[in-house]
């Protein structure tokens, strides 16, 4: 069953993405091996090694961290000053054939505003020499919910969100195995963002390799299974955001704990090896700072049993992606 077969879903989700072609090289992996890129004397990307496979991966980092440069290296727009970049087993730089595999949605507004949306997507289909450019164009427009009268208006009349969607349609028209998106949600309203996130999820589930950057951290947290954190041109951390946070042992984790006897529990926790500090909240409960996530989790249960205290809630207070990002940048 595809999403088209689910009653009431097509209007929201659009046509189901085609499975990514397997190809001779298997899954379309992106491999960066000790990659560095200089702009003059400025190091934009510094000795990054990573492998990205099928699914959705988020690039996270402050402005100027090197995210766009990294995407341009993967898309073959820039050559590595050192190291190698391959996509689906092919060298990315100076290789026009790579564009059969890659779809790119750049951050800047790289559209021909005098064309209609349909003409712009169709022109991309023809550049790829697709056998049925008209059908491919219609399918791509439907995937981004632009298969309306708006498709036949000039792009210069579009809102920012509509321009973003038409760029995504052009990137998808040839059904690439790899999709690279730089700040793809800019200008989209909440419904459009929800639809685009659902589309990227479904593409990832169908075996495509999706890499996107976003300055809206909640979207990265909701959308991507894997996060690559880029800080000052370096790969600062890699994994899901909870794993990244737990690996950062140089700073304490903060927990909100509610129990049947907060004072007794607080007194028993003070001085324990895994606990760095305890505060009683005026509204009830404890705020506990712990240096070792796993050790504290085990010790808290043991202490509660010893004191005859019933635990009502134990919640990490600082595991949002915003918190992870703040810690990584600060360090």
Feature annotation, model-predicted:
Residues 2-15, 292-331:
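C-terminal coupling/interaction segments
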Residues 17-28:
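Primarily ABC-family ATPase nucleotide-binding module
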Residues 27-30, 37-218, 222-231, 237:
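ABC transporter nucleotide-binding domains
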Residues 36, 92, 118, 210, ...:
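Alpha-helix N-cap/helix-start and coil->helix boundary motif
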Residues 132, 148, 276-277, 311:
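Residue-level detector of short coil/turn "hinge" positions at structural boundaries
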Residues 154, 283, 317:
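Residue-level "edge-of-site" marker
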Residues 196-289:
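ABC transporter nucleotide-binding domain
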